[in-house]
Amino acid sequence: EPLPTVLYLCGHGRVKRNGISYGNKVHYQHHGAWLAQNGYVCLIIDSLQLGEIEGIHHGTYRYDRWWWINRGYTSAGVEAWNCIRALDYLETRTEVDVSRIGCTGRSGGGAYSWWIAALDPRISVAVPVAGITDLRNHVIDDCVSGHCDCMYFVNQFAWDYPRVAQMVAPRPLM
């Protein structure tokens, strides 16, 4: 019988020991184990740069790559695409009830939960944990200097999190 499923999106954490990456997901595996023990299918995916997926998450402030924005690149967009592809994979699994797929995550994973729920109607419920701010805090208060680029979505319309929440509705966003 197909089971309800959770797409678990990793936040940020220390991932390399002695130069070897064990993936960011090792810090969150106990969450997936709890979900499995309680009757859910759970897929945990790594974050860009902070696990097994090579790339740069902190490009704008750490590497002064603000030009990325003008070129249409954002690590939030890359994370959203990774989530979409994870949902594509989950749809191929017979143990997954595709009508009951939720998403959650902490920190950066909380931010990705907002993105994927707004972008993909296959998410039936989203439960982001932390990982959000607003445009003023991100830019004016310089929150960007202490967080990675994925925590806020860059967009020409100056949309903020309330607008993203509207895109999730009427599905639950807790």
Where are these predicted regions, by residue range?
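Conserved hydrolase catalytic core segment
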Residues: 118-124
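Gly/Ala-rich phosphate-binding loop of Rossmann-like dinucleotide-binding domains
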Residues: 36, 117-118
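Alpha/beta-hydrolase fold nucleophile elbow
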Residues: 95-107
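Glycine-rich nucleophile elbow surrounding the catalytic serine of serine-hydrolase chemistry
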Residues: 105-117
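Alpha-helical segments flanking ligand/cofactor-binding loops in enzyme cores
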Residues: 33, 114-115, 166
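Short beta-strand-to-loop junctions in surface cap/lid or active-site-entrance loops
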Residues: 1-2
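Cap/lid segment of the alpha/beta-hydrolase catalytic domain
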Residues: 5-92, 132-142, 150
